[in-house]
């Protein structure tokens, strides 16, 4: 199963990052075959580390600013939702991008689990 791990860049802090990484390990579905990432700092990088340590392929969707301008991160989030079969969202309670992605999952019928950190 293609699992997207999304969340705020606020998880760069070492202590918070270690907690978030542990939560990835606890919440990732057992049948995960690929990790999907947005390529940003924070939770996206932790997702890529998890994939490398568990020998899982990674699909990274980077925002295309040349094509979409300031909408690039939102378009990237939509691409992630369209590609993923399951989304694991780490939310800090304030990230608008994560909230948007969770709402997109619900709208598109993509299973999503929100983990508050």
Go through each PLM region and give its residues.
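Acidic/glycine-enriched connector segments
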Residues: 2, 10-117
């Amino acid at each position: 199963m293609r699992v997207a791990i999304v969340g705020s860049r606020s998880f760069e802090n070492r202590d918070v990052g270690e907690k978030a990484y542990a939560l990835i390990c606890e919440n990732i579905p057992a049948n995960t075959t690929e990790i999907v990432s947005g390529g940003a700092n924070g939770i996206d990088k932790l997702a890529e580390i998890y994939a490398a340590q568990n020998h899982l392929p990674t699909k990274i969707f980077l925002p295309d600013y040349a094509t979409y301008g300031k909408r690039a991160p939102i378009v990237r989030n939509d691409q992630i939702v369209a590609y993923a079969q399951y989304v694991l969202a780490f939310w800090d309670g304030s990230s608008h991008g994560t909230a948007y992605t969770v709402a997109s999952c619900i709208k598109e019928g993509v299973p999503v689990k929100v983990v508050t950190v």
